[in-house]
Every structure is written in structure tokens, then in C-alpha cells.
Amino acid sequence: MARTVFCEYLKQEAEGLDFQLYPGELGKRIFDSISKQAWSEWIKKQTMLVNEKKLSMMNAEHRKLLETEMVNFLFEGKEVQIEGYVPVEQK
């Protein structure tokens, strides 16, 4: 049976992550209070950020920026702003 959490992002009970995906205390907080669906939405935003801003995970400043954006997105309800990104019109 899948574990459920009260997802802070979705503001409802949802299927939790299978294991801790991020290290440290922040990783424990994510595991305890973020759903698979919310994490999946974050991964899409993270990919866009890395690609559009040409971030390198070898750069500590870039990793810190991503972590800040992740906390803002998952826990504070702030949308990720990606300069120059224009969504494709859906038909």
C-alpha cells in the first residue's frame, strides 16, 4: 500500500514519495510533506530553470539557486519565474 502524506504544495492528502530524494533536513521535510505529484511538478520546473538559465550542478551558486527556488515552489506557493520562457499555445 502506498504511503500518504498531507502535501504542503497541494494542500491535501496525496501519495507520498517512496524514499527521501534530497539530502539533509530539507530532504526529510520534502519526504514527510511533499507528494509524488508535487515533486513531479517541481522536477519539470527545475528542468526548465536549468535549461533556460544554463545552470551547472558543478557550480555551488547554481545549486543554491535551485534549492531556494525549490523551497519557494514547494513550501511557499511561489511560482518559478523563467525569463524569456513563453509557453506553447495548446490547440
From Swiss-Prot:
UniProt key word Acetylation: no
A Gene Ontology biological process term: cellular response to oxidative stress
Transmembrane segments: none
Keyword Iron: yes
SUPFAM superfamilies to which the protein is assigned, alphabetical: YggX-like
Record-linked InterPro entries: Fe_traffick_prot_YggX (IPR007457), Fe_traffick_prot_YggX_sf (IPR036766)
GO MF terms, alphabetically ordered: iron ion binding
Keywords, sorted A to Z: Iron
Domain of life: Bacteria
Protein name stated in the entry: Probable Fe(2+)-trafficking protein
Protein source organism: Actinobacillus pleuropneumoniae serotype 5b (strain L20)
